[in-house]
């Protein structure tokens, strides 16, 4: 490895040949791992946004692109006729069911793309998080060490030098693969020209950090059913002060702030008088449908019983009429005049 290159784990050769059925998957996983820092740039232009924002056409475009890029067997489109939000809900088992020959690879590729999108937001080449000045116990950097021309390329606004070791230690808790590559022992050896080249290649893709972030008002487009709304909030880490996963694999989640969650749901439904009591009545409706259940002996702890893929299928069948009936019944109760005893 030349000095200044980012460390990428090599794929060690193995003496024994894998079973025939694993050749395609092994080759594709190796290609995914070797995408490296430019991986997100390989995607077609429209697909470089967050996967949860993909349209139905984008999902099918991604499917065809993945098949061509990684020589995957052709997958039937009817298994992926959904938007990006629904695609991100699918589990690995759902992918295997819809694409038996390549479901594992497609699932891992989607997770990789989502991870790379997060890395581009707060990665070390875009200045944002690493330029924050926070109190540290490290000695201040002498002025003569920060006046060099390699500190910042003002024409592009990209950081052309690794972050200060003090800042690296302060932000060590962030769970980001892009940050994990920056270790104090390798900061001095990074090739600044390589960093500048990478910043230039990803400049068009990552211009979005300068845009204001969407407000946390609880409004989610095209999301009418309560179970869908709850799941979308769980997928967005900005709403963790209100609701969060306790065990994502087991689909167990906790309502952290009941009143705050009710306000979000009320804002989404344009009902200013929404309370958690009213919202929980609608939530209990899903107990009867075996979609959500309350964890026994636990307060504000719930579990999704059906896989998200199954719920997406049910959304256009019997689930919406039942939801509408339940919502009408709740609204009727809310509108009944109070009678004094």
Curated annotation (Swiss-Prot):
GO cellular component, one term: chromatin
MF-aspect GO terms: DNA-binding transcription factor activity, RNA polymerase II-specific; DNA-binding transcription repressor activity, RNA polymerase II-specific; RNA polymerase II transcription regulatory region sequence-specific DNA binding; sequence-specific double-stranded DNA binding
Chief localisation class: nucleus
Lineage: superkingdom: Eukaryota
Transmembrane regions: none
Listed SMART domains: ETS (SM00413), SAM_PNT (SM00251)
UniProt keyword annotation of Transcription regulation present: yes
UniProt DNA-binding region: 224-305
Occurrences of domain PNT (ranges): 33-117
Region annotation (Disordered) ranges: 315-341
GO biological process, one term: cell differentiation
Pfam family, one: SAM_PNT
Record function comment: Transcriptional repressor; binds to the DNA sequence 5'-CCGGAAGT-3'. Isoform A does not seem to have a repressor activity. Isoform C does not seem to have a repressor activity.
Record-given protein name: Transcription factor ETV7
